[in-house]
């Protein structure tokens, strides 16, 4: 995740007066402004998961995520595995930040002006359609449920790799990549809602609607304490889960209904800005690394207890990798070329086709969202592991290709 494209910061409070939680948030927020930091932490978590899952202690890695944890409120109790609480509960906070980003950009950001947003919107759609079609062309019908896996972009990794290239590239590249990635997130949310929420129990939407009504009522009453929204948000989450849809969609809903205007005389900044600023560092340095630790532990050989390859796993891994590494940049370039050719829009000032290829390569870093979609697409452990291996391979290749191409662009610019 990333901050808004042009963030407005409220005046900081004196550190000595801040509670411990606020001081931790302030520290993490300062770290998160270094774009590479989030990607580096995510990479460390993924590497730790891979090392653990392929070590002599691999059994303890898998056992950890199956440890049952219970949450009880009065006489009501919910017991699920630690893996569930990470993927289905904590990731709701990740999707809340996604919803907040989309809400802000729709209100007064790059998505508020259709003309400015048209090219990155088309680039994002091309970067979704081409990888999906390429994947479908490479796999047999039995594996087609994973078509959406190579459509996602990991903002933290992509922006982190771009930051490693330094300041020798035009600033417009970062803005374009961020805009493309935000739209990519929106498309991914729609894909999850429309294609990976089968067997919906429509009567249970009443419970979700009750939770949402509670959130909206608190807003109308002018309640601005975040903790006051937790019970209503929990009802919304539980209701969506009971419908058969993925419960993390509750985070997107909450983000999209967060107020964008501050109460006159009562708030220094709008709630959507304050909530995003508070949650962003915790998501970047807590939720996302924990998700990587819980999901990137794929056995690569006998040391990790890997089972004999099931039919189709090799093809699945290759299809995901090819669709991300080749399909993403091809889709981005093709969509933008058609848009320019048809005179629907023009390339941003200071951005050439080489820079556009760089954004396409970095968009091929799927990681977090791609692995998340894979967990929804495949019930078979063997197929899920193969899809994860494809995502990890593709993300590494896309990062290396992006670094190499970005370095070449910088060198060409300095020698021109």
Swiss-Prot record:
Keywords: Antiport, Cell inner membrane, Cell membrane, Ion transport, Membrane, Sodium, Sodium transport, Transmembrane, Transmembrane helix, Transport. The keyword Ion transport applies. It catalyses: Na(+)(in) + 2 H(+)(out) = Na(+)(out) + 2 H(+)(in). GO terms for molecular function: sodium:proton antiporter activity. It is found in: Cell inner membrane. The chain crosses the membrane at residues 39-59, 82-102, 119-139, 146-166, 175-195, 198-218, 234-254, 281-301, 315-335, 353-373, 390-410. It is a multi-pass membrane protein. It comes from the Bacteria. Belongs to the NhaA Na(+)/H(+) (TC 2.A.33) antiporter family. HAMAP family: NhaA (MF_01844). Na(+)/H(+) antiporter that extrudes sodium in exchange for external protons. This is Na(+)/H(+) antiporter NhaA. It comes from Acidovorax sp. (strain JS42). The lineage of its organism: Bacteria, Pseudomonadati, Pseudomonadota, Betaproteobacteria, Burkholderiales. The gene is nhaA.
């Amino acid at each position: 995740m990333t901050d808004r494209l042009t963030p407005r910061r409220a005046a900081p409070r004196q550190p000595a007066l801040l509670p411990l939680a606020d001081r931790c948030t302030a520290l993490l927020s300062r770290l998160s402004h270094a774009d590479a930091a989030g990607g580096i932490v995510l990479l460390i978590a993924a590497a730790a998961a891979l090392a653990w899952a392929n070590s002599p202690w691999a059994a303890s890695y898998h056992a950890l995520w199956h440890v049952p944890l219970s949450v009880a409120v009065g006489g009501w109790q919910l017991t699920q595995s630690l893996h569930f609480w990470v993927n289905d509960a904590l990731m709701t906070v990740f999707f809340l930040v996604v919803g907040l980003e989309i809400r802000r950009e729709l209100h007064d950001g790059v998505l508020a002006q259709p003309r400015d947003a048209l090219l990155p919107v088309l680039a994002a759609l091309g970067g979704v359609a081409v990888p999906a079609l390429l994947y479908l062309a490479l796999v047999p019908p039995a594996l087609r449920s994973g078509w959406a896996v190579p459509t996602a972009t990991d903002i933290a990794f992509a922006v982190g790799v771009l930051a490693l290239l330094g300041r020798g590239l035009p600033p417009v590249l970062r803005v374009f990549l961020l805009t493309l990635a935000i739209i990519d997130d929106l498309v991914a949310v729609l894909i999850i809602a429309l294609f990976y929420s089968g067997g919906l129990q429509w009567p249970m939407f009443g419970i979700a609607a009750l939770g949402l009504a509670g959130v909206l009522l608190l807003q109308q009453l002018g309640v601005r304490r975040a903790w006051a929204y937790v019970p209503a948000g929990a009802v919304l989450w539980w209701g969506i889960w009971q419908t058969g849809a993925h419960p993390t969609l509750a985070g997107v809903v909450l983000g999209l209904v967060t107020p964008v205007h501050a109460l006159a005389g009562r708030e220094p900044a709008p709630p959507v800005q304050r909530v995003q600023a508070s949650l962003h560092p915790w998501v970047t340095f807590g939720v996302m690394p924990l998700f990587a630790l819980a999901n990137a532990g794929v056995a690569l050989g006998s040391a990790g207890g890997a089972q004999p390859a099931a039919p189709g796993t090799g093809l699945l891994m290759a299809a995901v990798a090819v669709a991300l590494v080749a399909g993403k940049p091809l889709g981005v370039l093709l969509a933008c070329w058609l848009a320019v050719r048809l005179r629907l829009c023009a390339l941003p000032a200071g951005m050439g086709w080489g820079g556009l290829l760089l954004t396409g390569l970095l968009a091929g870093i799927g990681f977090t969202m791609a692995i998340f979609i894979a967990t929804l697409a495949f019930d078979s452990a063997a197929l899920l592991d193969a899809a994860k291996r494809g995502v990890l391979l593709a993300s590494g290749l896309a990062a290396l290709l992006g670094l190499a191409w970005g370095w070449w662009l910088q060198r060409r610019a300095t020698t021109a």
